[in-house]
Amino acid sequence: METVQMSLDLQPEDTKANIECSSPDYEIKCFSHNQFAPQIERLKIEKKYIHIVEETETFNRKLVSYQANKNQSIHNWIRYKEGFSSELVQNLIEEFGLSKGDTILDPFLGSGTTSLTAKMLGINSIGIDILPISHIAFEPKSFIFEYNLEELDRAYKEIYEISPTKIEQKFNHLSITEGAFPEETENDLLFFTHWDNNSQYSYQTKTLIKLILVSILEEISYTRKDGQYLRWDYRSQKVIETNKKRLEQGKEPIKTILDKGELPTVKESLLNTLLTIKEDIKEIQQKCLPNESVHELIKDSALNALPKINDNTFDAVITSPPYCNRYDYTRTYALELAYLGVDEKKIRELRQAQLSCTVENKSKLKQLKDYYHSLFLESRYAEIERLVTGNEVLNEINYALRKRWENGEVNNKGILSMVDGYFTELTFIFYELFRTCKPGAKVAFVNDNVRYAGEIIPVDFLSTKIAEDIGFKPIKIYTLKQRKGNSSQQMGKYGRVALRKSITIWEKP
């Protein structure tokens, strides 16, 4: 959204006198390093919501990340680092008092932790996600009570006895995944993919094997996920060719320390993973009884899906949106997406369709306006747009970042549009959540605060303000004892500021 001009009077005199730009606790007392930009509105919401903050050990860093799922049956079938843990979802379900027959929503489904945890407890769920990696992560897990163990044993035996042969099919790489596998590994991967597609096993078993093939891609490749990028083994053609060009140009070769050692074969990884998953399925089928809960996966973005859902549908929402941290899931999971048939054009479309969290995202306002018009919801769109343009806190943040950009402190102008787009789109999502939640429904959002160019963005409190403006009642903001750090570049220039990792809890009256 266009921002309004802000007063350069940074804060009232009594506030100025008491500012501390470094504080050991979770309260933020200085949002703009060296008071460079206005921070009155951010200080106001800090004061308004600080009394509902509860520092907690019940929800720790392990629970609000994938770490606690690493040893959890089902949830560890595919590594999805951006997710949260099943234990977190169980704790929130208990706190919200949900029971069998209730319906829970996760508008950013990821690897499906919310829906799968609900399934085990007999609670209905709807999950929304646009990324194909999310779809393949969730669907095979949702079949947990449907698998035929004898059939899985037969599939295991057949794979064990197979010797892969040369296949003419080629892996449809993206430019950033080219050369990810040794030649023989790539051939074997395609061989087993073709075998799975053409086998006579049930849909459930075939989909499970597809999940396993996706889950082992990193393990059998020259790549390793590192933040939002792929790191490359020194033996990969990408590193070899890059260094060759650098030497021809008289430059030093890239110094890479990644050495993954001997890579397992596709067959080894497939068999080992299938064996582990078979044991998980056997144990869960023995310990747990199937229930009649219903679970729906909507393969779309939350921005598109939510406006079409009926009023008063959900008893709770538990989710974690992509963070406003420039991480691009289409790059992090490029290898998996390429394997699933996503080409360069589709990658760009997926990147733009996701919640704006990368510097490449463009404004979705015209697209959203046209979409709401197509659904005959023009008045709803206009109401949401008014909430965005009237958001004084977001206007202040936009102004502060623009001033930092003009001062040469923002290293990518796309950060400005990303931050504005992020909260603009969350306003649409929060509005639709309020409409689709039943009275009394509680909403939990897991998110991190961020800082760009010395400007702190209180994601937790700003999200809570937006939610309250829409009609939600703020209940509590859990903050973790473990704070989030800053990039080395920011610490070097602006000092270290501990940022909150929070779980915001709201209720529809």
Curated annotation (Swiss-Prot):
SUPFAM superfamilies: S-adenosyl-L-methionine-dependent methyltransferases. It catalyses: a 2'-deoxycytidine in DNA + S-adenosyl-L-methionine = an N(4)-methyl-2'-deoxycytidine in DNA + S-adenosyl-L-homocysteine + H(+). Its EC number is 2.1.1.113. InterPro entries: DNA_methylase_N4/N6, MeTrfase_CN4_CS, SAM-dependent_MTases_sf. The keyword Magnesium does not apply. The keyword DNA-binding applies. GO terms for biological process: DNA restriction-modification system; methylation. GO terms for molecular function: DNA binding; N-methyltransferase activity; site-specific DNA-methyltransferase (cytosine-N4-specific) activity. Keywords: DNA-binding, Methyltransferase, Restriction system, S-adenosyl-L-methionine, Transferase. Belongs to the N(4)/N(6)-methyltransferase family. N(4) subfamily. This is Type II methyltransferase M.BsoBI.
